[in-house]
Amino acid sequence: MKLGFLIPNHPNEKRVALLPEHVKGFNNELVIETGFGETLGISDAEYVKVGCTIASREEIFKTCEGIFSLKVLKPQDYKHIREGQIIVGWTHPEGSGKIFMEEQGIPKNLIIVDLDNIHPSIYYKDYVIPMEWIPSNFVRKNSYIAGYASTMHAVMNYGSIPTSETKVAILGSGNVSQGAFSAISKFNPDIRMFYRKTMNQLKDELEEFDIIINGIEMDNPNKHILTLEDQMRLKKNCLIIDAAANLGKAIEGARHTTASDPIYNKDGKYYYAVNNSPSIFYRQSSKAISEAFSKHVYSKELEFYLDVIAEVEEMIV
């Protein structure tokens, strides 16, 4: 079966999710969109050399059973998506890809292989099948880069260099928070780390912080770390960096921003929430993604996902 790789049409997305050096022993026939590796200076010929076929975007939709798109497919591609195709990538069906699921995923019976770092799952119709064969945290390097990149990018666009007098709160202890800590600590500010069990301490001291960096993803859309009421207590000009880009969940009311317009002001506070910040350091993040996905995703035969869905449909009957 054929797995086609598309250039993501997400704003400012420069990551290349498959490098020629990682194309080894795959069972699927790989079809690469023309210019796929251009941002890294990788020619189409380099993909051909390792056994890939080069094709146009439209041809890939027409001829490939599986479609890989790093970010959720946009409306301009909807007309090309065929009934029952396998869509692989960061679709985030319950988050930024919810509209895609409503307009394409469910109506066209698509098999969505969502490569969430912590909970990779297959979405089909109204069913969610955990991919337990993929280890949780399998692309942790990209998450670390997300924390690092978000912090550096936010500070640069906020326009003020942190000092030893700058008070910083970092929420969480996972990969994203670790990356954020690595970045902000270079300025030698006054840093406090808060975890899920110590959030009450954060709430007691909200007014003290100049920068708050979130590295936690919340599963419950109705439960927030920083509510609107909490945010009203923050000091004027406080910079809130949602490095986890959790779209209004961890930080109530926060919205996604873009690399070209990364910060907005609301009630005297500044918010940053770029949901593809690792693309800022796209050379390192491309390698991290390509390595992890090649090992755990691309090497898997597409027939496997069809078999999983067949088992689900048998149970339905």
Swiss-Prot record:
Its EC number is 1.5.1.24. It catalyses: N(5)-[1(S)-1-carboxyethyl]-L-ornithine + NADP(+) + H2O = L-ornithine + pyruvate + NADPH + H(+). Changing R15K: Loss of activity. CDD domains: ceo_syn. It is an enzyme of class 1 (oxidoreductase). One of its GO terms (molecular function) is N5-(carboxyethyl)ornithine synthase activity. This is N(5)-(carboxyethyl)ornithine synthase. Gene3D superfamilies: NAD(P)-binding Rossmann-like Domain. SMART domains: AlaDh_PNT_C (SM01002), AlaDh_PNT_N (SM01003). It comes from Clostridium botulinum (strain Hall / ATCC 3502 / NCTC 13319 / Type A). It comes from the Bacteria.
